[in-house]
Amino acid sequence: DRKKDMIISGGFNIYPSDLEAVLSEHAEVADVAVVGVPSQRWGETPLAFVVLRPGAATAAQALLAWANGKLGKVQRLAAVEIVDSLPRSDVGKVLKRELREAYQAAGKADASG
């Protein structure tokens, strides 16, 4: 993981790739990116952006509960946002900065978790 993508939540280091790997195990998840967003309580908290497979109907809350049931207490996600696609660079890398900025611009800047 790139160091700038690492999430520091309550003094613990959380690697987005670990959380993305768990979410990718879900049968209805096609693509996923996890970013850290500001939290009054924890400093930062993990937030997942998920693209569902065609025809999938899993709700964000159900996916959140499923993932948090598999993750350690420190790694738990604050929220899951279902999106149509993830922004990518010309070489196919997910642009996590754009996801973070869009989330904050939408007025959801504090995911207290």
Label for each model-derived stretch:
Residues 1-75, 84-87, 92-94, 98-101:
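AMP-binding/adenylate-forming catalytic core of the ANL superfamily
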